[in-house]
């Protein structure tokens, strides 16, 4: 039986969390098995076409790198949850794995924001030249700034996340130990605002402006904008799916959970209900590591064409070998 002790304020509760032994290893295994090859292929594909990098593919490259680094840490979490929260890998590894999760989460959000702004400029301001003059150099500087901001945002994870002891077993706390829930609360809320709400507001503003242009009759928009219309629509749909599955449910349940676990008056069943809701959405926040490569595939025509060419070549090779084997 999997249980977690919670002690904060005047509350001392024992949570029953058997669901984590099934849900979290299952979702993390799917993310690992799909995310590792998909992001490796994206990075390899961009590397092969590095002489023809665009601003969007530079953002996609950084997005794939963040996803790949994160999925490499998932085997530790899969082992942890299959062993009923037992963490044998030490305190620093616990802190680093939690740091990996949040840097990937908020890095993905910011890089998707950059891609959305880039697409917004192409659709709503196709004749503007200020963002084109700097070209790739400006894009690389933006990526460096994103990494700096994300690392600075998530560094306090090394202070709050830590190992502890429950029922004579070492565990790795996700947010903070229960007795530090009150001190973690301001940081957790600030991270949600700066790492999710503000970028999400920027994306919504870009998409509303883009929708106004894309919904116009074709004869009212320029040829250059018309060519980008389908690509922009695909990107909007996929980014909305990523936010709907990965980001919004997680941040909503996390914020509510931070509020209730900092309270000194709520009964244990209420605390457990919100804890379960939060911990059920947490593994799905990792799904962006699978969805991001799909975004790359559906918004990059050259990548789709090269992928089809590779698959056709592999299929032809298989049919040829199969016919030879059958004939002999």
Curated annotation (Swiss-Prot):
Question: Does the keyword section mention Glycoprotein?
Answer: yes
- Keyword terms, alphabetized: Cell membrane, Disulfide bond, G-protein coupled receptor, Glycoprotein, Membrane, Receptor, Transducer, Transmembrane, Transmembrane helix
CDD domains, alphabetically? 7tmA_P2Y6
TM ranges: 23-43, 58-78, 97-117, 140-160, 190-210, 232-252, 276-298
- Give me the Extracellular side stretches, as residue ranges: 1-22, 79-96, 161-189, 253-275
- How does it sit in the bilayer? Multi-pass membrane protein
Q: Where in the cell is it found?
A: Cell membrane
Q: Which family does this protein fall into?
A: Belongs to the G-protein coupled receptor 1 family.
In its UniProt entry, what is this protein called? P2Y purinoceptor 3
Organism the protein comes from:
Gallus gallus (Chicken)
Name the gene.
P2RY3
């Amino acid at each position: 039986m999997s249980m977690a002790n919670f002690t904060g304020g005047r509350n001392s509760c024992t949570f029953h969390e058997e669901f984590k032994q099934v849900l979290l290893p299952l979702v993390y295994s799917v993310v690992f098995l799909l995310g590792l090859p998909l992001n490796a292929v994206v990075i390899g594909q961009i590397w092969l076409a590095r002489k023809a990098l665009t601003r969007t593919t530079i953002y996609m490259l950084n997005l794939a790198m963040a996803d790949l680094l994160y999925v490499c840490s998932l085997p530790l979490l899969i082992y942890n949850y299959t062993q009923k929260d037992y963490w044998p890998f030490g305190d620093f590894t616990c802190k680093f794995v939690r740091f990996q999760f949040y840097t990937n989460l908020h890095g993905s959000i910011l890089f998707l924001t950059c891609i959305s702004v880039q697409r917004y400029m192409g659709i709503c301001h196709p004749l503007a030249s200020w963002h084109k003059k700097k070209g790739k150099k400006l894009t690389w500087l933006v990526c460096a700034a994103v990494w700096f901001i994300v690392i600075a945002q998530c560094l306090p994870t090394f202070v709050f996340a830590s190992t502890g002891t429950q029922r004579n077993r070492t565990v790795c706390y996700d947010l903070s130990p229960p007795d530090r829930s009150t001190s973690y609360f301001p940081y957790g809320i600030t991270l949600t605002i700066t790492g999710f709400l503000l970028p999400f507001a920027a994306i919504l503003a870009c998409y509303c402006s883009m929708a106004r242009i894309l919904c116009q009759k074709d004869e009212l928009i320029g040829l250059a904008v018309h060519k980008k219309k389908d690509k922009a629509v695909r990107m909007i749909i996929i980014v909305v799916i990523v936010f709907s599955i990965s980001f919004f449910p997680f941040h909503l349940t996390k914020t509510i959970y931070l509020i209730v676990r900092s309270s000194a008056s709520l009964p244990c069943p209420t605390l457990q209900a919100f804890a379960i809701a939060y911990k059920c959405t947490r593994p799905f926040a990792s799904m962006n590591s699978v969805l991001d490569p799909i975004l790359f595939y559906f918004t990059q025509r050259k990548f789709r064409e090269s992928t089809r060419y590779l698959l056709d070549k592999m299929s032809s090779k298989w049919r040829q070998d199969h016919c030879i084997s059958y004939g002999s």
